[in-house]
Amino acid sequence: LRRQRQMCIRDSSYLEHSADTLGMYQAVLNSNVQPIVATFPLKTVRKEGETTNYVIDMTDYIRKDNEMFSFTSRVKDNIGASSMVDDASYIDTLKAFPQNIEIRTVRTFQRKKGGGSGLEKLLAAFFATSTTPLTYELNSSMLLLPKEPMKPRLHDDRVGYFAVSYKDFDENPQGVKYKANITRWRLEPKDEDREKYLRGELVEPKKPIIIYIDPATPKKWVPYLIQGVNDWQAAFEKAGFKNAIFGKEAPTDDPTWSLEDARHSAIVYKPSDIPNASGPHVHDPRSGEILETHINWYHNVMSLLYNWYIVQAGAIDPGARKPMFDDELMGELVRFVSSHEVGHTLGLRHNFGSSNTVPVEKLRDKIWVEANGHTPSIMDYARFNYCLLYTSPSPRDVEESR
């Protein structure tokens, strides 16, 4: 927003929808003034043909304590932080890519007396006497949205997609209808293949989903992470696309390639003791289009996989009865979780109801399991088929029933 030689930044909301060709549009616009979070004087204005370029200086704003580039008040409360120490806070790096800008800052805060509302509250005695400040490294991303939003697809509660909710003022002339658009990737057939696609032939998408593997990933796990991505190819073939998604090693001979470039989705390997992995994505709030993903792969997820497998499969798989699994077994477990997290990045939620459709007797039917698997959905939490073991009362059951 430009006004009186100033540029204003608004906190835009997409919670209310009305088409600009209908009568409600102006009323909805008038009733939803977006808050102005910052203003900047224009340093210079330059016209290039039909394009006008505006230059502002955001350096001080980025460096200072505000909720756009720093912590929210809730986060500060959780970590036990109070005011920012200006002379111990600074902009570290700023990188510009074709579709995004990455700003890394270092911020130092005074400790709040008594700690925060999270773990720090339990350590209040320490925080009450400590004067050591808190220093954090933060990264802020600014991503350019597509010029033309993708055509949205309405959410259906019967299908487990993440969705972007909004109020629709158009469909019901005598009320408001609550709707939601699912989050999904923009997969489209190439122009020359459109007729083939409409005839039901398999075609390659105009822009496939490529998920790179972080170069810092230990080499022995890379093939399994890639296979976890590629396992989704069969699902996209049912939707008419071949080679729609694939994992790929990050290039090592291209100095311009970066994990921070929003054009590149990736599985990022993190040397963390968190026993987990997560599959978030960034989407366009206007349409639900998924723009990119950085899957968090924490090193210690393998301890979780070890515990799951030794408990659920140790009785029937000798390979599980070891203090450390063979790389091949652990690799297959890595592939399993990789595929699950990729499902989240495709817009899919957990499907906890899927395993309920399979009777226990089917799980003990070797031929049926070989043909169908032990769970209908990788998005369920049906880890391993531990029902295989007990097909009849055990000797202990018989003894205790006497």
Report each predicted region and the residues it spans.
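Conserved catalytic/binding loops enriched for acidic/polar residues
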Residues: 354-357, 361-392, 396, 402
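Active-site recognition of the HExxH zinc-binding catalytic motif
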Residues: 336-348
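Conserved small/polar residues in nucleotide/adenosyl-binding loops
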Residues: 4-12, 390-399
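Zn2+-dependent metallopeptidase catalytic core
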Residues: 218-244
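Auxiliary tRNA-acceptor-end handling modules of aminoacyl-tRNA synthetases
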Residues: 1-6, 10-217, 235, 250-305, ...
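Stable alpha-helical elements in mature extracytoplasmic
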Residues: 221-228, 330, 334, 338
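Short, glycine/acidic-rich hinge or "gate" loops at secondary-structure transitions
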Residues: 240-252, 351-362
